[in-house]
Amino acid sequence: MTGDKLSNQMWGGRFAAGPAAIMEEINASIDFDQKLYRQDIEGSLSHAAMLAQTKIISHSDYEKIVHGLQLIRQEIETGSFTFSRKLEDIHMNIEARLSELIGPVAGRLHTARSRNDQVAVDFRLWVREAAQKIAQALKDLMEQLLMRAEQHADTLMPGFTHLQTAQPVTFGHYMMAYVEMFGRDLSRMRDAIERMNESPLGAAALAGTGFPIDRFMTAQALGFREPTRNSIDSVSDRDFALEFLSAGALCAMHLSRLAEEIILWSSAQFHFIRLSDAFSTGSSIMPQKRNPDAAELVRAKAGRLNAALMGLLTVMKGLPLAYSKDMQEDKEYVFDGVLNLELSLAAMMGIISDLEVNKEAMKQAAGSGYAIATDLADWCVRELGLPFREAHHITGRAVALAEQKKCSLDELSLDEFQTLHPDINAAVFDVLTIEKSVESRNSFGGTAPSEVLRQVAYWKQHLVTA
């Protein structure tokens, strides 16, 4: 049977002529939705089992349908299946092949089902599986960051605001900041999985069906928590895809921030880290170059996730209930988003696991830029009882004096300090080191090594069940 006749047979009973060539061109989605073949077959197998259980079809017909679907799955996975654009999508391609294999019995499979709920369940299954893989990749990256944080709980480096040296911190503390970000990403992904874990199968076109189906049976068979509660919403909803892309875009944004730091830190101007050969490239003209291309691509791919989210939001904006063909455009945005997020997470995992930390360069930079100025102000508050604003002013004058003399704060003499305030005494020099500065920041969540290790311990335990 030819493709155009099959296509017409599926839905064309009231049409006198076939579609125009350009209609077939714009209507076909098989080039991309063939990714859903496994989910489509799983959905059909569970639907067929339910139809047999409820005696809507005979057990004999059910066995023929199962056998045919299993053959089709084998053909697709071995590359012998021929996809036809004339048959529009993965659902009709599989149904047409099933008709060729088992004859008219194949037509019974679509009893009490529409392509509207069929594609909705296929897509939910696919997105749920993708989200679970992303969640695992996030956990793996967090574990790698935790290992780095534990190794470098006391490795000194400068902390920045406005990309200017602010206060000394530790590299471990910095890594833990990203653990927190990715922890939120993981939580959002788990929440999205929980919300999408309802089966739309059985909603039919939009109004449900008059056949005595068991939606709870198919939901359970497909691993869903329960069936969706409103048949119109079931086929209209793409929130699950949007929520996944939203969580993915946030994750990609966090990855891009870490990528930017890696790009800066690996530059000759910072020299904080060295990227491995595996995640660097060279220049076609400048032989000395080590370009952080992997990190740059991770940084850029955040734009792909943002574009996917904005694209699907725009497709769905203003659509009346229930299903509209516009919704066919949902899949490419999600497929592209998943591909680029998976690549970004895998690349960042490799970058973090392979990079070398230059402790000496970090420590030297941590002591530059008068990073311990805040410690001087805090000492004036604690030891001299000064209001913080007055202590801030005194410290600012101390920095100006040190800049004038081209020296560090701890190189100022006691006499020079006492010109700023007569009560300053020799004990002030005890706090004017980056080591003391970091050790003193032991408030909950702070940069002190003891606090960093506490944060590491918390997340190690939390990730066991996350």
UniProtKB/Swiss-Prot annotation:
Q: Where are the transmembrane segments?
A: none
The protein's predominant localisation is cytoplasm
Identify the keywords attached in UniProt to this record, alphabetized.
Amino-acid biosynthesis, Arginine biosynthesis, Cytoplasm, Lyase
| UniProt-listed Pfam families | ASL_C2, Lyase_1
**Matches recorded under InterPro entries:** Arg_succ_lyase_C, Argininosuccinate_lyase, Fumarase/histidase_N, Fumarate_lyase_CS, Fumarate_lyase_fam, Fumarate_lyase_N, L-Aspartase-like
Report the top EC class in one word: lyase
Its localization reads: Cytoplasm
Gene3D superfamilies per record: Fumarase/aspartase (C-terminal domain), Fumarase/aspartase (Central domain), Fumarase/aspartase (N-terminal domain)
Establish whether keyword Phosphoprotein is in the entry: no
Domain of life of the source: Bacteria
Which GO BP terms, alphabetically? arginine biosynthetic process via ornithine; L-arginine biosynthetic process
Instruction: Write down the EC number.
Output: 4.3.2.1
**GO CC entries:** cytosol
Give the HAMAP family listed for this entry. Arg_succ_lyase
Hey, which family's this protein in? Belongs to the lyase 1 family. Argininosuccinate lyase subfamily.
The molecule here is called Argininosuccinate lyase
Q: Which organism is it from?
A: Bartonella bacilliformis (strain ATCC 35685 / KC583 / Herrer 020/F12,63)
